[in-house]
């Protein structure tokens, strides 16, 4: 008999000899992120509600749940500022993690390695198309503010250092050439007439 699923567990039922034998194995449960939905074909969609317009803002479709969660976090900080509920802390932010033991007063404070750094290591040159969203440009869910362009460029050069020297291209504008332009023949595109005869 085929396996069935019940409450996140896989149950295999086999009938043999005198009765039924049931084997239960726990399946690995996926982590669910705020603002992220898994598509049936395996990719992850990210969206957020705009608090001002009370509408959904589409942030994009991503290969991993962590990338989609990062897009949601960036949009949440853009919309709600420091009060935003996010999936991951900002780099350098410490998080409170409960050890899960009997003593709930014990709290272990650690700095969490963010998924953004792991994504940068795996895909340092990943490029995404830009989309115009609300107040700025969104590149795969990350908003672009022209006033912060210099600091973003400095951070990008630190994270993804350029391995080649830039090349200056100079255009020679001072040279003038005479171009002979002949007038084009007028096209007669009246469909009621026979096609024009072209002289070769």
UniProtKB/Swiss-Prot annotation:
Family annotation (PROSITE patterns): AP2_ERF
Keyword Amino-acid biosynthesis carried by entry: no
GO molecular function, one term: DNA-binding transcription factor activity
Keywords: DNA-binding, Ethylene signaling pathway, Nucleus, Plant defense, Repressor, Transcription, Transcription regulation
Region (Disordered) residue spans: 1-22, 84-104
DNA-binding segment(s): 32-89
Record motif EAR-like (transcriptional repression), residues: 189-195
Protein localization: Nucleus
Pfam families assigned: AP2 (PF00847)
Gene3D superfamilies: AP2/ERF domain
Cited InterPro entries: AP2/ERF_dom, AP2/ERF_dom_sf, DNA-bd_dom_sf
Listed SMART domains: AP2
Description of its domains: Contains a slightly degenerated ERF-associated amphiphilic repression (EAR) motif, which may be involved in the activity of transcriptional repression.
Function: Involved in the regulation of gene expression by stress factors and by components of stress signal transduction pathways. Transcription factor that binds to the GCC-box pathogenesis-related promoter element. Acts as a transcriptional inhibitor and may regulate other AtERFs.
Assigned protein family: Belongs to the AP2/ERF transcription factor family. ERF subfamily.
Protein name: Ethylene-responsive transcription factor 9
Source species of the chain: Arabidopsis thaliana
């Amino acid at each position: 008999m085929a396996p069935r699923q019940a409450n996140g567990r896989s149950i295999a039922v086999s009938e043999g000899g005198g009765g039924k034998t049931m084997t239960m194995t726990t399946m690995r449960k996926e982590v669910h992120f705020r603002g992220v939905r898994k598509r049936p074909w395996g990719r992850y969609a990210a969206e957020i509600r705009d608090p001002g317009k009370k509408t959904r803002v589409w942030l994009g479709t991503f290969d991993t749940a962590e990338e989609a969660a990062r897009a949601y976090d960036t949009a949440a900080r853009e919309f709600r500022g420091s009060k935003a509920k996010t999936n991951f802390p900002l780099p350098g932010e410490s998080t409170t993690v409960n050890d899960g033991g009997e003593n709930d007063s014990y709290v272990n404070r650690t700095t969490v390695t963010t998924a953004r750094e792991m994504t940068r290591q795996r895909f340092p040159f990943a490029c995404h198309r830009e989309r115009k969203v609300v107040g700025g440009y969104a590149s795969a869910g990350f908003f672009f503010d022209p006033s912060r362009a210099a600091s973003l460029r400095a951070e990008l050069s630190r994270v993804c250092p350029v391995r080649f020297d830039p090349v200056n291209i100079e255009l020679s504008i001072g040279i003038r050439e005479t171009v002979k332009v002949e007038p084009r023949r007028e096209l007669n595109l009246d469909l009621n007439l026979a096609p024009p005869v072209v002289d070769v």
